[in-house]
């Protein structure tokens, strides 16, 4: 049975306004869980499986189905993807197989789940939704920008609670280089930079974004945000910067949020 809305953990398939289901697809792992949409907390444990190699659309879809079926979930679900997605169709592929490009991920994953309704969105966009509803950006009006610092730089823009998808600020040109070539945390590690030296590059990226859209708040995500005290105070841009609060659950939570929004509009 396919639900028309979010479910309860007690009765899979029942409709309520409390619970949703999210899947976070990463280069190394695919994880999912049931989310309490009132609190943004996971209900029970999540399930995490290794991302198949090669990470082709069908192989990933089958792994997603394993996670979903592990919970007995039969309602709509949200799935994050590490790249640009428009109208359910994948446009870029960085950490997954190139055969994703042009694939209707919504239909491919839905077919493996027997026709369950699937909402696909960029992974940073999912994290941005979660952080602005339940995390570091909660109760922050106006324009909020989430930046995830890792191998590259992911981005999400939320305006008064509404997602503006696929911003891809990591590819913004800053001083003749893409932003992520200048300030991804992987660049810091590769060059063995100190936090002060890396913070100068992050500042340049933040100022470039500020000059374009004048945000009210930056949220810094990615593993390096756990050490925000070592570098956020060194930033010299004008907009406040706060570390992400949800960390490893943000993708799952944001995906669950998106699935509910997709079924109620």
Swiss-Prot record:
This enzyme's EC code(s): 2.7.1.63, 2.7.1.2
Molecular function in Gene Ontology: ATP binding; glucokinase activity; polyphosphate-glucose phosphotransferase activity
Ranges where the record places region Disordered: 1-22
SUPFAM superfamilies tied to this protein: Actin-like ATPase domain
Function statement: Catalyzes the phosphorylation of glucose using polyphosphate or ATP as the phosphoryl donor. Polyphosphate, rather than ATP, seems to be the major phosphate donor for the enzyme in M.tuberculosis.
Miscellaneous field: The poly(P)- and ATP-dependent glucokinase reactions both follow an ordered Bi-Bi mechanism, with glucose being the second substrate to bind and glucose 6-phosphate being released last. The mechanism of poly(P) utilization is not strictly processive and is most likely nonprocessive, where there is dissociation of poly(P) prior to complete utilization.
Protein name as it appears in the record: Polyphosphate glucokinase
Organism, scientific name: Mycobacterium tuberculosis (strain CDC 1551 / Oshkosh)
Lineage, highest ranks first: Bacteria, Bacillati, Actinomycetota, Actinomycetes, Mycobacteriales
Gene that this polypeptide is encoded by: ppgK
């Amino acid at each position: 049975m396919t639900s028309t809305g979010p479910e309860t953990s007690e009765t899979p398939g029942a409709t309520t306004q409390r619970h949703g289901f999210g899947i976070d697809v990463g280069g190394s792992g695919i994880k999912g869980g049931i989310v309490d949409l009132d609190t943004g907390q996971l209900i029970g444990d999540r399930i995490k499986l290794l991302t198949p190699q090669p990470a082709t659309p069908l192989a990933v879809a089958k792994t997603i189905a394993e996670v979903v079926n592990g919970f007995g979930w039969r309602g709509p679900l949200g799935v994050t993807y590490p790249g640009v997605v428009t109208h359910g169709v994948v446009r870029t592929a960085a950490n997954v197989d190139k055969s994703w490009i042009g694939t209707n991920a919504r239909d491919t994953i839905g077919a493996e789940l027997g026709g369950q309704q699937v909402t696909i969105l960029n992974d940073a966009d999912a994290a941005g939704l979660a952080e602005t509803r339940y995390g570091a950006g909660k109760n922050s009006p106006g324009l909020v920008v989430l930046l995830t610092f890792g191998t590259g730089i992911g981005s999400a823009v939320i305006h008064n609670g509404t997602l503006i998808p696929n911003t891809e600020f990591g590819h913004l040109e800053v001083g003749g280089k893409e932003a992520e070539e200048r300030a991804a945390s992987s660049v810091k590690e590769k060059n063995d930079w100190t936090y002060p030296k890396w913070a100068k590059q992050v500042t340049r990226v933040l100022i470039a974004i500020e000059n374009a859209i004048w945000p009210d708040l930056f949220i810094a995500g990615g593993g390096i945000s756990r050490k925000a005290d070592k570098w956020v105070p060194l930033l010299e841009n004008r907009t406040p910067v706060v570390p992400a609060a949800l960390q490893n659950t943000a993708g799952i939570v944001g995906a669950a949020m998106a699935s509910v929004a997709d079924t109620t509009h």
